[in-house]
């Protein structure tokens, strides 16, 4: 999330949102991942503070949740945005948010969840075009199973296996270390919390352990991590049998 690196520098999220609205995308609609730290704080507390900037923006700001229960997050977001920004009523009598704001969820949307979201919005008198729904790795990589006569979907994504690639470290103009991390409060499965700063992996009696929160120089000492991809090129290629040996302690 772009919010993580900005938070590490600015100490808040509102500065970056203003920058996105007025400098980066002043004449375009864009979606903004909003759950890097505290999604509902951003929706309920930060958005009202920049209401004028959002309404003056030449485009639509789409508030994107990316953790928690998608059905609850999407529908509750629409309700909160209506309280803050208001809107109009269409010809069928359904509420439509101000065109400068909308809710979006880019992943974890199955057909069943989509139907649930639309059903709840209709129940509370909101038009379904208040939300945008996407299809991503969750939707494409779920295994469908039957349990107790009902269909269940088991996700197998990068978050399931903890292999998502996230930036965790940067340096300022004067070389000062900047620790980047994300820790969404809405992440009920604890899949998305990232390490902070540079990391060191070391061998233990049980396998491997790690230490984070390090500077670049500190992470170079006794580190089992090896660079395999840098500046668009492979620097080292591991065979599958090598990966298995590392994983299982050389056996």
How would you label these PLM feature ranges?
Residues 61, 66-175:
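C-terminal active-site-proximal or functional interface alpha/beta core segments in diverse enzymes
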Residues 56-60, 94-98, 225-229:
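Short acidic (Asp/Glu) and glycine-rich catalytic loops that position anionic groups and cofactors
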Residues 1-91, 109-116:
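Buried, small/hydrophobic-residue-enriched core segments of structured protein domains
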Residues 183-251:
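Extended hydrophobic packing segments that form well-structured cores
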Residues 152-205:
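An anionic, glycine-rich sequence signature occurring as long contiguous blocks
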Residues 41-43, 143-144, 237-238:
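Short helix/loop capping segments that flank catalytic or ligand/cofactor-binding pockets
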Residues 25-31, 53-55, 93, 170-172, ...:
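Domain-wide signal for the mature, well-folded portions of proteins, strongly enriched
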């Amino acid at each position: 999330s772009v919010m993580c690196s900005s938070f590490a520098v600015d100490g808040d999220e509102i500065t970056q949102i203003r920058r996105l609205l007025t400098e980066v995308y002043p004449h375009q609609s864009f979606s903004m991942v909003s759950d890097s730290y505290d999604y509902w704080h951003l929706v309920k507390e930060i958005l009202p503070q920049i209401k004028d900037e959002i309404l003056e923006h030449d485009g639509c700001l789409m508030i994107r949740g990316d953790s928690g229960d998608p059905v609850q997050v999407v529908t509750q977001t629409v309700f909160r945005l209506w309280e803050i920004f208001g809107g109009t009523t269409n010809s069928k009598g359904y509420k439509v948010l101000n065109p400068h704001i909308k809710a979006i969820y880019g992943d974890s949307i199955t057909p069943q969840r989509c139907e649930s979201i639309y059903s709840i919005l209709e129940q509370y008198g909101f038009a379904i075009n208040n939300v945008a729904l996407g299809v991503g790795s969750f939707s494409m990589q779920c295994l469908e199973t039957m349990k107790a006569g009902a269909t269940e979907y088991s996700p197998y994504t990068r978050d399931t296996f903890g292999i998502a690639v996230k930036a965790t470290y940067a340096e300022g103009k004067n070389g000062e270390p900047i620790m980047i991390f994300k820790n969404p409060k809405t992440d009920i499965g604890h899949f998305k919390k990232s390490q902070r700063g540079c990391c060191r992996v070391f061998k233990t009696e049980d396998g491997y352990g790690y230490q984070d929160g390090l500077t670049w120089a500190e992470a170079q000492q006794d580190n089992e991590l090896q660079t395999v991809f840098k500046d668009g090129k492979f620097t080292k290629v591991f065979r599958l049998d090598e990966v298995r040996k590392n994983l299982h302690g050389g056996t």
